[in-house]
Amino acid sequence: YLQDLNSMMDSWSLERLLCYQILQESFALSASTGSYTIGTGGVFNTARPTKIVDPCFVRDASNLDSPISLINTEAYGRIVQKSAGVTYPSFLYYDQGYSSSGLATIQVYPTPSASLTLFINSWKQLQSFGAISTVIVLPPGYQRAIEFNLCVDLAGGFKSVQPEVA
């Protein structure tokens, strides 16, 4: 049942209404670098985001913030000169494709010409369980929701009892 529980938690991570936290994190952007891996063991070493959402921004050494717009695959593909350098990038593209390492990629455009700090807001995968006895802390209401939905999920594997006709 542990695998069923973790599978359910994994699928819940894709639903905004079930994601109880949008986490803001910051990462160092290096001058002249526009591509960064993100995920456990990546350049941005954090739990791999399920989704990155607005608002995102960069902060310079003077603590001035500049917004960054999220763009999709199509918009990123239309950028002809991806290595153009300016002080502040204007766009962020999150490539969620899975590599063999399980990492995703963040592209910032234009490539910054100075070191900056990137702030992103992301959905994180709901915690999985290492064992049935694993204790996790959840917001109010989640324990019952998990118990109920796991029962519903597991019930499909059992045959229903047919009442006998007298």
Protein language model regions, located:
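Glycine-enriched, solvent-exposed interface loops adjoining structured elements
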Residues: 1-166
